[in-house]
Amino acid sequence: MASFKLPELQPDNDLWGPASGSNALPAELKDIPFAPYAKNDKVGRIADWNNASGASNDAANARGGRQGRARDVQQNFGTSAASSAFAYFHGDDEASFSVVDNTRTVASRRGGLGQMSQRGGRGGRGGAGGAGAAGGRGASKFGAGAGRGARGGRGGAAGARRGGGRFGWKEWDKPQRIREASVTVGQDWEQVEEIDFVRLGKLRLEVEEPQDISSYGSLFEYDRSYDRVTVKTAQSLSSIDRIRYNTTTSEDPVIHDISAKEDAQIYMTDSILALLMCATRSVYSWDVIITKTADGKVFFDKRDGGAFDYLTVNENAADPPSEASEGKENEAAAKANAINTPSALSLEATYINQNFAFQVVNEKNVYKLEHENPFYSSDETAPLASCAYRYRKFNLSSEESDPVELVVRTEVDAYTVGASKEKQLITIKSLNEFDARAQGAGGALDWRLKLDSQRGAVVATEMKNNSFKLARFAVQSLLAGADSMKLGYISRANPKDTSRHMILGTSWLKPRELAAQMAVNLSNGWGIVRTVADLARKAEQGKYVLLKDPNKQTIRMYRVPANFGEENDEIVEEDEADE
C-alpha cells in the first residue's frame, strides 16, 4: 500500500510561513530570474528569457491585427513595465493557413464607417447671429433688426474630422467634452452644501393647489388662423417690435409689497422655480442668486444675461452642439460652424420664441387683468407685448409646526375663447430646427419632410433632445394655471442663414398631459424646492449662489460676498450711459 510522507521544510524560528532566507530555495532554482507582478496581472507565461524589460513584440505590434491590439490592452494592467513581459497574447494558430474565396461579390451602395465619415465630412454652415436688446433692467426687446446673421462659407475640414473622429474601444478613458461654469467660482467663496442628482431624485413632497394673490398686465387673443399652418402653407416669422419684461425677483415692486404684508418666507419667479423642479434633467451649468434678509425672508434671483434669459437647444442630445474649436488650424472650421454653436443657437432660439409669441396674437382683442403692467413706464416708446403676471402662493409645509410658504410670479402669454365662451389662459412656446445634417442635431428628422406626416416622431425626438427645456415649459404652464400650451415648430428658411425663419406648424398641448408624457414628477420637483429652501432658511443672513456643476450631476451652494452681482450691473449701466 502506498504511503504518504510530508515534505521537509526549512526550520525558521522568526517567521511563520515559508522561509525567506538565502537557503529557502533549492540550489537548482536559485539562478532563475524573477520579475515583480501583482495578483491582478494577466499572467500568460512564467518567464521571458530573451527580453525581460518588456520591450518585446515590436514586430508583432507593427504587423497589427489581433496580436497588436491584445498588446495594447495589457498596458492597462500591471504594476510596472517589467510585468508586461508576462502578459498574455493570443497567438494566431491559423497564420499559416488561408482560404481563397473566388466567389463574386456584389458591391453594396451603402457604405459602412467610410460612408459615415464622408457624410460627416459635409461642411457646416457658416455665419454669426446676434440679437438686439433694449429697455430698462430686466426688459427684453427684440426689434426689427434682431437676430440678423452674416452669411458665411463652408467648412468641409471640420465636418470630415467630426464625422471620422469616433470613440473606439481603446478611448474609454479619454476626457469627454469639458464645459465651462455659468459663473466663475471666486477664491473668497465658501462652499456650504453639495448635493448630487441621485439624492435629489429621491425627494418627494405633495403640494396642494396654490392661492391667487393678484394679477397684472393685459393679454391679446390668440389668432386661430395659425392652427391651419402646415409645411406647404408655411408662414414667415416676422420680427415685431414689442417690449416684454423679465425682471428678477428682488427688483419686482409687487413682490416687495407682498413681502411686506404676507408672512411667506420664500420668493421667486416661475422660471427659477421650474428650473429647480426640473434640475435633475439639466446638463449645462446654471446659477441662482439667493439672498437672505435680516427678517428671515429668502429671495431667489437671476443674473442679467444668465441662463434664465436664454433657451438652450438640444441640451439633452447624445451629441449636443459643440463650441467652435480654437487655434489657427481650426479657424476655417470655427467660422463655418459659428452659427451652430450652443451660444449662437441659444440666442437664435430665444429670438424665435419671443417673436413667435408676438406674432400669433390678435392685438385687436384685449383682455385686461386687475392691475396694469407694474414694470411699464410712460418713458417707453415701444408698445407692450401680450403678457400677464399672476402672483400665487404655494404651501410647502410638511408639518404644522414649521410653516413654509412660497410666493411665485407666474406668466401667461395670451388667451383664447373656448367652446363655453369663457376666456382660457394659454402659454405660447416654440421649438426650432437649425440643420438636420449639422453636428448637434441629435438625429432629428427633416421637419419639411416629416412634420406633417410623422409629427409624433418629430415630437418624440424633441422630447429626447430637449428634455430639460420642454419639462420647464410644461412646469411653467402648470405653475401659472394655464389651460393649454401652444407649441410652434419653426425652422430656418435656409440652413446657413439665421436671419430668416419659417413657421411650419403648430399644435395644442395640455401642460399636465405633456408633463406626464415626459415623466415629469411634480412631487419630486417640490421636494427639490423644499430642500433648497430649507438650506437657505437655515443659512445665516447674507448672499449665496446655487451653482450647477458644468461637468457633473451636482449642485453646490456657496456663500459669496455681499456685492456679488452688483459689479456686473455697474458695468452694464456704464455701457448704457456711453451709448
From Swiss-Prot:
Annotated stretches, region: RNA gate? 307-321
GO MF annotations, alphabetized: mRNA cap binding; translation initiation factor activity
- Residue ranges annotated as compositionally biased, kind Low complexity, are 51-64
Provide the protein's localization: Cytoplasm
Which residue intervals are annotated with compositional bias (Gly residues) in the record? 120-167
Q: Does the keyword RNA-binding apply?
A: yes
Record GO cellular component, one term: eukaryotic translation initiation factor 3 complex
Region (Disordered) residue spans: 1-20, 51-72, 109-170
User: Which InterPro entries does the record cross-reference, listed alphabetically?
Assistant: eIF3d
Q: Which UniProt keywords apply?
A: Cytoplasm, Initiation factor, Protein biosynthesis, RNA-binding
Q: In the record, which residues are listed under signal peptide? A: none
Domain of life per record:
Eukaryota
Q: Which family does it belong to?
A: Belongs to the eIF-3 subunit D family.
Q: Spell out the PANTHER family in the cross-references.
A: EUKARYOTIC TRANSLATION INITIATION FACTOR 3 SUBUNIT 7 (PTHR12399), EUKARYOTIC TRANSLATION INITIATION FACTOR 3 SUBUNIT D (PTHR12399:SF0)
Domain comment, as recorded: The RNA gate region regulates mRNA cap recognition to prevent promiscuous mRNA-binding before assembly of eif3d into the full eukaryotic translation initiation factor 3 (eIF-3) complex.
**Name of the protein:** Eukaryotic translation initiation factor 3 subunit D
